[in-house]
């Protein structure tokens, strides 16, 4: 998860660098009036057209703690902040291209009917696709040298809402006619999945000189992989509007996959899996549920994988203190007094999150995010330690602690790269922090999307994996929520013992795994927030074994 420093001020947990946090003198909520003003203004804007009666009804429906926190925020913001509604997610400048190899019209796909086994006719695929089109460009592998395999790039267009999602597909290096297909999603919310491509698990990385370096442990060694920039205005994606919650983004992803597999039926017959990390812990349960809700579909969804995700905040936030205070396998980052302060803040934080879970209201969920993130993430950030890797300091405050993110952005901003991919925006950014704030202030951050997981487990396997050196979405919290999840297999899963996880040809283990009834948890040693970056060989090993069904319920 990632955010801008101003958003950290009001608690979004996808932290920017601690160095930037300190340099801009950002302490807790009340320490920076102007940043608070900028960050809270979108809340006012979102209610600009709300009637007074509904406004009062929503406010009066909050519990006392949520009201108290809104009162604290109100003291920081002058009345002028509520005067004019302005949309804070600025649209990207873009110019439509005409040179596409294929255009798939959702309206045409919507018209297709087939006869079922019962002899009755029904639509070939479900869902509302009329407004969607898919544009496809065949990428010449020799132009960029990222990989030698067959590649496609392009946009999913929602013409009615002016939304355009960019994707980049790489065929499997091994046996594309039979290997599975994986959709990869980075988190944020608001971070490009092309960072996952070049920083973690794609066929190549980018060095300091912007040269393409082959990755021998790429996830497309034995699977075809789609990297998707979503929601809109992330990476190469763009829109004049904005998506501000996970559920809305799920409709777009379903449409993209449906039209892609319609255009390329040779991949539609393969097993399909969704994988992602960080805020994808929100995305993936929603996206998988959206796909599974359509009985008639051409998406052969077989499993989902969530790495170092944020999925159940109520359970996970309890484990920031132990991770920061020396109980997660690494030395303590915080002092004893700071750890005690976290202990003291936990009851209020949990009460606020529970109220968000119960009401689902922006008025309850935004205060929960603001308070909890300032109490549990702010103290860690102020130490200068890397929130994505507890083993070291944040080394590059301009690029979320990792200089390579800057190299990737520079590479993807080159005109020849953009032309080769059919890109329509004028510039690329690894993360769009406006979107991050947008999701935060629409109450998406603290939503209980883990409640969708039991329904998913009824149909497909779920893997939760976590690098054990990550702080921001740490392994303690991920293990805890997977064990706290209420589902029919809970007792069996919790009784299952953690077993050694190691490469078949190696004696040294690289993690632990427990599995029962379609649910699997993995702890990956010596890996931070981005497991494939820190443990490339080991992550490819567990991916291949997972896709091969090693831990699937038979």
From Swiss-Prot:
Its EC number is 3.4.16.5. The keyword Disulfide bond applies. It catalyses: Release of a C-terminal amino acid with broad specificity. One of its GO terms (biological process) is proteolysis. Its main location: other. Keywords: Carboxypeptidase, Disulfide bond, Glycoprotein, Hydrolase, Protease, Signal, Vacuole, Zymogen. Disulfide bonds join 191-431, 325-339, 349-372, 356-365, 394-401. InterPro entries: AB_hydrolase_fold, Peptidase_S10, Propeptide_carboxypepY, Ser_caboxypep_ser_AS. GO terms for molecular function: serine-type carboxypeptidase activity. It is found in: Vacuole. The active site is at residues 278, 470, 529. The keyword Glycoprotein applies. One of its GO terms (cellular component) is fungal-type vacuole. It comes from the Eukaryota. Glycans are attached at residues 222, 518. Residues 1-17 form the signal peptide. Belongs to the peptidase S10 family. This is Carboxypeptidase Y homolog A. It comes from Sordaria macrospora (strain ATCC MYA-333 / DSM 997 / K(L3346) / K-hell). The lineage of its organism: Eukaryota, Fungi, Dikarya, Ascomycota, Pezizomycotina. The gene is CPYA.
């Amino acid at each position: 998860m990632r955010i801008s420093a101003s958003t950290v001020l009001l608690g979004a947990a996808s932290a920017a660098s601690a160095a930037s946090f300190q340099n801009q003198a950002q302490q807790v909520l009340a320490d920076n009036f102007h940043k608070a003003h900028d960050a809270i203004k979108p809340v006012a804007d979102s209610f600009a057209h709300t009637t007074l009666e509904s406004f009062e009804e929503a406010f009066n429906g909050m519990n006392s703690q949520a009201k108290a926190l809104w009162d604290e925020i109100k003291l920081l913001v002058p009345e002028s902040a509520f005067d004019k509604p302005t949309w804070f997610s600025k649209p990207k400048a873009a110019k439509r291209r005409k040179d596409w190899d294929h255009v798939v019209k959702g309206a045409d796909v919507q018209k297709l009917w087939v006869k079922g086994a019962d002899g009755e006719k029904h639509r070939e695929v479900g869902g509302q696709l009329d407004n969607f089109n898919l544009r496809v460009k065949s990428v010449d592998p020799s132009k960029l040298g990222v990989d030698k395999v067959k590649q496609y790039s392009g946009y999913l267009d929602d013409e009615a809402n002016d939304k355009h999602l960019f994707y980049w597909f790489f065929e499997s290096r091994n046996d594309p006619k039979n290997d599975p297909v994986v959709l990869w999603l980075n988190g944020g919310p608001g971070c490009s999945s092309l960072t996952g491509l070049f920083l973690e698990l794609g066929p190549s990385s980018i060095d300091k000189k912007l040269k393409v370096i082959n990755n021998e442990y790429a996830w497309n060694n034995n699977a075809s992989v789609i990297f998707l920039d979503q929601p809109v205005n992330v990476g190469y994606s763009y829109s004049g509007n904005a998506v501000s919650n996970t559920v809305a983004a799920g409709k777009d992803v379903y449409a993209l996959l449906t039209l892609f597999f319609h255009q390329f039926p040779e991949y539609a017959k393969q097993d399909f899996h969704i994988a992602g990390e960080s805020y994808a812990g929100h995305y993936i349960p929603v996206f998988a549920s959206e796909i599974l809700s359509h009985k008639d579909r051409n998406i052969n969804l077989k499993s989902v994988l969530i790495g170092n995700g944020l999925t159940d905040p109520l359970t996970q936030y309890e484990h920031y203190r132990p991770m920061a205070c020396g109980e997660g396998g690494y030395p303590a980052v915080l002092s004893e007094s700071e750890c005690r302060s976290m202990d003291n803040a936990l009851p209020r934080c949990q009460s606020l999150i529970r109220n968000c879970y119960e009401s689902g209201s922006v008025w309850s969920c935004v205060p929960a995010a603001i308070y909890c993130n300032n109490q549990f993430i702010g103290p860690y950030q102020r130490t200068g330690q890397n929130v994505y890797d507890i083993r070291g300091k944040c080394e590059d405050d301009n690029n979320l602690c990792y200089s390579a993110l800057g190299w990737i952005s520079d590479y993807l901003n080159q005109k020849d790269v953009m032309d080769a991919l059919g890109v329509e925006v004028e510039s690329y950014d690894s993360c769009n922090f406006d979107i991050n704030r947008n999701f935060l202030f629409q109450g998406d951050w603290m939503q209980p999307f883990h409640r969708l997981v039991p329904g998913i487990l009824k149909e497909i396997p779920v893997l939760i994996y976590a690098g054990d050196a990550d702080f921001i979405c740490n392994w303690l919290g991920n293990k805890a929520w997977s064990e706290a999840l209420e589902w029919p297999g809970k007792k069996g899963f919790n009784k299952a013992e953690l077993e050694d996880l190691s490469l078949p040809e190696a004696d040294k283990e690289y993690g632990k795994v427990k599995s029962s009834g379609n649910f699997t948890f993995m702890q990956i040693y010596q890996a931070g927030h981005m497991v494939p970056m820190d443990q490339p060989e080991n992550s490819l090993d567990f991916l291949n074994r997972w896709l091969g069904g090693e831990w699937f319920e038979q």
